[in-house]
Amino acid sequence: MKKTTIGFAMTGSFCTFEPVLKQVEELVKRGYDVLPILSYHAGSLDTRFMQAERLRERLLALTGHEPIDTLQKAEPIGPKRMTDLYVMSPATGNSLAKLANGIFDTPALLGAKSHLRNERPLVLAVSTNDGLGAAAQNIGKLLVWRNVYFVPFRQDDPIGKPRSLVADFTQLPKTVSAALSGVQLQPLIAACVTMDALGEQPIIH
């Protein structure tokens, strides 16, 4: 029986690459054929979190596929029906803004557009310091799009970065499974833990 193929696009929230790669590995373990796609920044920038070439090597080792990293390679995703489901994880505020406003100028975004033409599910795993700021309106737009699903997300640092939102990447496989059945995994807003005003008692939100 043919495996379910997941297009897995990574954009430039570099600090989340390690937990995201763990979920790529988990999806492969669950029997999915994972096709990696990289935005220009994710695929080319060396950062203190990971070298670009190292990211490519790890994706190839995990999935058995060379990452799609050009517009020319991403364009056939829809016409050739290459993906049953498409993930963008991490999805930066910049990528969410472009997606919400019809700008598809990177391999990750063009792949998403090409995939959506077939009325197939798109899963977004948010990672942005402006999730409750400038990016909020774009998240709101995407929440009501047909065939778009979100990995549950939370404020990752409500005191230090009160506008920041990050997906609970451990929920990505469950979100994928639900989205393949046309269901949004709930609850969408994940709990977060902070300390009280005196820094003494944990508060679960």
Outline where the language-model segments fall:
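A cross-family phosphate/adenosyl-ligand binding-site feature
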Residues: 1-122, 127-205
